[in-house]
Amino acid sequence: MIKINNVKDVFLCLLFFAFHCAGQSNDSRKFEDIISDAVIEVPSAELTDSDFFKSVDDLTIIHSYQVQEQIDWYLGYDYAGTVTAFERSQKYIPAIENIFEQEKDLPSELIYLPILESGFSPVAVSKSNAKGLWQFVSVTAEELDLMDDSYVDERNDIRKSTKAAVRHLKYLYSVFKNWEFALAAYNGGAGYVRSVMSKNPGMNYWQLAEANKFKRETALYVPRFAALLIIQKHLKSTTIYPKLSDLKYNYMKVTIETPATISDISKSFGISEKKIREFNPQLKGNVIPPYYKTYSLLIPNSESIAMLN
């Protein structure tokens, strides 16, 4: 029997077995079975929600079997989807990272939440009609002053939706005072999480999830995010990393005088209309919203344009 008392050693063992079955669709064994086959003895620990991001960073959160299962899912059964999401993240993270850098009281790790929410697709649409990188439903978008009319849907706007997400996350944290509940509320709604908490006083997020007090999606939301953060933090050690392209995107925020069309902008900047739409997916048609005197767009800089072309 292999006895492991160091949390980081536990993590490395978990990754070894996860990577072993990554992308192998013919291996139907569950992650816990693979671990059991290796006869690894993991020390027990009580998870608290005192500092979610610290527990991810120092890997103590690995003691949660829910997190272990989600690492297995992302590096095993959903391996192709995970690779795609991390590939997309390279394209859009530079655009949202700058916004988070201005928010000193928000954990920087939150820039990776769109991997969970949308697979980092700014045009993603859920079954509940939530849209964009940050997956806002229309009611929440309206509360956050994101416009949706015949010209734009700002839920798909990379910068504006990110600024709205920052406001929303700050609000949720101010309500719940810890990130497990704030993240659960981002998924299930603040009212829903308050209701579950009021019916089960004194229980933390992990206890509520373990006791099936949350609906399944909300119970899995925090473990899934933790798993993705761990993968991201150790990305170079994964089999995902060699599959990612070397492209690095940098952007300019350009101000356009209206009236203007995407066709006009394409000619002015020497970038295809397709690429303009890719970085400004909020635009519904060819016409820039005419009710603004000027309008800001996200355009790759000259070096990025050269790589794209």
Where do the protein language model's features map onto the residues?
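Substrate-binding/active-site groove segments that recognize
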Residues: 128-149, 162-165, 193-196
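Short, functionally critical alpha-helical segments immediately adjacent to catalytic or ligand/cofactor-binding
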Residues: 106-122, 182-187, 276-280
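Primarily a LysM-type cell-wall glycan-binding module
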Residues: 243-270
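LysM (lysin motif) carbohydrate-binding repeats in extracellular/periplasmic proteins that recognize
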Residues: 261-290
